Amino acid sequence: MSRIGKSPVQIPDKVSVDINGLTITVKGPKGELKRLMPEGVDFVQKENQIVVTPSTTKRYSRERHGLCRTLISNMVQGVTDGYSKKLEIVGVGSRAQVKGKTLVVSAGYSHPVEMTPPDGITYKVESNTNVTVSGIDKEIVGNEAAKIRSIRPPEPYKGKGIKYQDERIIRKAGKSGKK
C-alpha cells in the first residue's frame, strides 16, 4: 500500500465534497473543481475526511492509490487557498503587461507574444518583470506557468530569459580566450 495513500484527506468546514462513482466534485469558497479519477481505487467519505483505498491488490490499483489521494488533497487545497506560480523576466528590454485578460510578453522577438488564459486562471504583473499565474487547479496553473517560461527559457551564460522565481540557473563559463 502507498504511504501517501494511507493517510486520509481532511476536509475543512467550508468545503463540500461529492463522490459520484469515479467522479469527485469539490466545492469551496474559491470555486468548484470536478475530476474523473482512474479505476482501481475506492473512495469513502467519513465525517470531515475522505479515505482512499485500492479496490484490488493488483499492481495498477496500488499505483493509483497515492495518486488519487494526492489529487483529492490538491483539489481541496485549491478551492480553499488556491495556487500561484511566480515568474521573473530577466534581460534588457524584456517585459510583460496585462491587456484585459491577455498577457503580452516582449521577450526579444520581433513581435510581442500574447497568451490568453484558460477559464479559472488569472495573470498579474508587478513592475513589468514579475508575472504571477494564479488559479484553483494546480495542474493548469503549473502548465500555464510552463508555457510562459517556454517563450524564452533562461540561457546558461548570462541568465537572460523567463524563469520561475525560486529557480536557480546553472551558469556556464564563456569561451576562454586564445593564449
UniProtKB/Swiss-Prot annotation:
Pfam family, one: Ribosomal_L6
Domain of life of the source: Bacteria
Residues spanning the signal sequence: none
A biological process term (GO) from this entry: cytoplasmic translation
InterPro entries to which the protein is assigned, alphabetical: Ribosomal_uL6-like, Ribosomal_uL6-like_a/b-dom_sf, Ribosomal_uL6_a/b-dom, Ribosomal_uL6_bac-type, Ribosomal_uL6_CS
Keyword rRNA-binding: yes
Function, as annotated: This protein binds to the 23S rRNA, and is important in its secondary structure. It is located near the subunit interface in the base of the L7/L12 stalk, and near the tRNA binding site of the peptidyltransferase center.
UniProt name for this protein: Large ribosomal subunit protein uL6
Organism from which the protein derives: Prochlorococcus marinus (strain MIT 9515)
